């Protein structure tokens, strides 16, 4: 059955998802902040709301939409990161504003450019509401995107957020020409660091080795289609954070996520050494060769 899907965010990811599901026969409407339109208009005649905005825009958008949210409208959160003020994930932000809403998370090794090209991929729909996850899995099936489900949205979002930081570190490693041994060691320890965050936040250890954990890390930390990886390459070339972001020319979640996660770690006594090094480099404490 065709769904009426509203997508918040017309960036690369939101646009890709909209085209993917439109090609699968669903009815799509897409909102962008640049349009100047009231996002609440998307709540009407809608079966599923999809949030694909950058992390920096989630809190404001959730607050604006909460007073108008239909009781039975589910939300699929597709943003990856940690809010620097609330120190929580995108779906958790939405849940705070919509305490009664059914919410799921979409995450996995999904480089938007490859999906646009019709290349195959797989992703996870995670929710504490198993019935919702299974329903969305069936409804959102697409020719080139296979969907799985899990019941661990906390671990899924933690992995999706911190892998961006690891991708920055991987870009630095490759940009400095440190070799395959160093890269493999970095990703191995990066995976362990993601596991530390998942466990500390109450997620499941099994999530670490699935599509949302290892799968997403491998894709993001090894491809120049990844903005976070390219950002790391620019840092290795000697760019500071501002210049590197300017050269990317689009949202890069890694820097903000690294700082937010490190604040969480400091408050709770968690040890996240790679994240610490990335933040130290961003703050100018040392250059990429020393990190």
Residues of each region from the PLM?
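Internal alpha-helical scaffold of NAD(P)-dependent oxidoreductase catalytic cores
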Residues: 24, 57, 68, 93, ...
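Fold-independent oxyanion-binding glycine-rich loops
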Residues: 10, 33-34, 53, 78-80, ...
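Alpha-helix C-terminal capping/helix-to-coil transition sites in glycosyltransferase folds
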Residues: 44-45, 162, 214
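Conserved active-site and cofactor/substrate-binding residues in soluble primary-metabolism enzymes
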Residues: 8, 12, 16, 53-56, ...
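General beta-strand structural signal in soluble alpha/beta enzymes
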Residues: 77, 102-107, 147-151, 209-210, ...
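NAD(P)+-binding Rossmann beta1-loop-alpha1 motif at the extreme N-terminus of oxidoreductases
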Residues: 1-48
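Rossmann-like NAD(P)(H) cofactor-binding subdomain of soluble oxidoreductases
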Residues: 14-17, 41-120, 136-138
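NAD(P)-dependent Rossmann-like dehydrogenase/reductase catalytic/cofactor-binding core
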Residues: 170-171, 199-209, 213, 217-291
């Amino acid at each position: 059955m065709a769904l009426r899907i509203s997508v918040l965010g017309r960036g690369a990811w939101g646009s890709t998802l909209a085209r993917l599901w439109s090609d699968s026969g669903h009815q799509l409407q897409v909102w962008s902040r640049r349009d100047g339109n009231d996002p609440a208009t998307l709540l009407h005649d809608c079966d599923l709301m999809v949030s694909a905005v950058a992390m920096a825009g989630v809190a404001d958008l959730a607050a604006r939409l909460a007073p108008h949210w239909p009781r039975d409208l589910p939300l699929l959160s597709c943003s990856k990161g940690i809010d620097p003020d609330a120190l929580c994930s995108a779906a958790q932000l939405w849940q705070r504003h919509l305490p009664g809403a059914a919410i799921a998370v979409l995450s996995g090794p999904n480089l938007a450019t490859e999906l646009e090209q019709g290349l195959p991929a797989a992703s996870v729909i995670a929710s504490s509401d198993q019935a919702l996850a299974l329903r969305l899995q069936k409804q959102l099936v697409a020719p080139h995107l296979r969907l799985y489900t899990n019941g661990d949205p906390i671990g899924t979002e933690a992995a999706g957020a911190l892998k961006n930081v690891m991708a920055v570190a991987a870009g630095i490693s490759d940009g400095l020409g440190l070799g395959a041994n160093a890269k493999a060691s970095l990703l191995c320890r990066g995976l362990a660091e993601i596991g530390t965050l998942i466990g500390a936040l109450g997620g499941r250890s099994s999530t670490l080795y699935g599509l949302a954990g290892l799968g997403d890390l491998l894709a993001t930390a090894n491809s120049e289609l990844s903005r976070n990886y390219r950002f790391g390459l620019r840092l290795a070339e000697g760019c500071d954070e501002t210049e590197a972001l300017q050269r990317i020319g689009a949202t890069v979640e890694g820097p903000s996520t690294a700082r937010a996660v490190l604040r969480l770690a400091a408050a709770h006594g968690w040890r996240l050494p790679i994240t610490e090094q990335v933040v130290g480099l961003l703050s100018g404490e040392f250059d990429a060769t020393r990190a």
